[in-house]
Amino acid sequence: MAERGKRKFRTGIVVSDKSNKTRQVSVERTYRHSLYDRVLRSKSKFIVHDEKNISHVGDTVKIMESRPLSKMKRWVLVEVVNKTSEI
């Protein structure tokens, strides 16, 4: 049996939980510009599959790359790292 390649993991913050079993997660990364030697920040939004609807807006979550689940969903929720307090 063939082994799967190494999967990518990201940590981000849930920015939308309006859809059932689907979350929008914003992932921020920092990198240094090669020419100007300045630290830059960039954000990416990922559409994530949340099978049990356990995450909510503001939660910090860990996501993993997976096979395509729909037109935009290619990531799956692995765990909720830090929950926000319910007000």
From Swiss-Prot:
Gene3D superfamilies: Nucleic acid-binding proteins (2.40.50.140)
Keywords assigned by UniProt, alphabetized: Ribonucleoprotein, Ribosomal protein, RNA-binding, rRNA-binding
Gene Ontology molecular function: any one: structural constituent of ribosome
SUPFAM superfamilies cross-referenced by the UniProt entry: Nucleic acid-binding proteins
GO biological process, one term: translation
CDD domains found in the cross-reference section: Ribosomal_uS17
Xref: Pfam families: Ribosomal_S17
Keyword field contains Cytoplasm: no
GO cellular component: cytosolic small ribosomal subunit
HAMAP family: Ribosomal_uS17_B (MF_01345_B)
Subunit structure, as described in the record: Part of the 30S ribosomal subunit.
UniProt family annotation: Belongs to the universal ribosomal protein uS17 family.
Annotated function: One of the primary rRNA binding proteins, it binds specifically to the 5'-end of 16S ribosomal RNA.
Identification of the protein by name: Small ribosomal subunit protein uS17
Species this chain originates from: Endomicrobium trichonymphae
